[in-house]
């Protein structure tokens, strides 16, 4: 039986929540739309993006995990900038986590949809590490 987008997001949320990646960040893991607006923590947001019922019992699609990192006042001059060191640490850990995802741990097969990178979120003085994954799901 095919899964819905929310069911897939729920599955990925559990994978992230129970990962070493979650223990690396100082915030929480949230499903899309549930992170507190004023959070200044390193929070991971899991979002289902697209899904296709390609061939029964196979589904495929894309999910994204964004890990927010608060900007820092690096020069003590009141100007907030990207915490390059921390973003790099999280990018490397995220890459290691993605490489550890194997089909023998679940019915999902993952591959990176694009290189893991950091993007600016200027309205909240934070940046986020973006992990975009393609998935294939076997539903028996």
Where are these regions (language model features)?
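Charged, amphipathic alpha-helical segments and their flanking helix caps
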Residues: 1-26, 48-140
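Intrinsically disordered, low-complexity, compositionally biased regions/tails
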Residues: 9, 31-32, 37, 65
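N-terminal, polar/charged subdomain of small-to-medium soluble alpha/beta proteins
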Residues: 28-35, 41-43, 86
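Short secondary-structure boundary/capping segments within folded domains
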Residues: 35-40, 53-57
């Amino acid at each position: 039986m095919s899964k819905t987008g929310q069911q897939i997001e729920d599955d990925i949320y559990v994978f992230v929540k129970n990962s070493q990646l979650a223990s690396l960040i100082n915030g929480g893991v949230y499903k899309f739309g549930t992170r507190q607006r004023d959070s200044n923590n390193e929070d991971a947001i899991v979002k289902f993006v697209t899904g296709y019922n390609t061939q029964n019992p196979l589904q495929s699609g894309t999910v994204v995990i964004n890990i927010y990192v608060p900007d820092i006042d690096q020069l003590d001059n009141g100007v907030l900038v990207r915490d390059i060191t921390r973003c790099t640490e999280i990018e490397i850990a995220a890459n290691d986590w993605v490489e550890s995802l194997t089909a023998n741990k679940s019915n999902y097969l993952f591959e990176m949809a694009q290189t893991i990178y950091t993007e600016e979120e200027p309205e909240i003085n934070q940046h986020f590490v973006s992990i975009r994954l393609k998935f294939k799901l076997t539903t028996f």
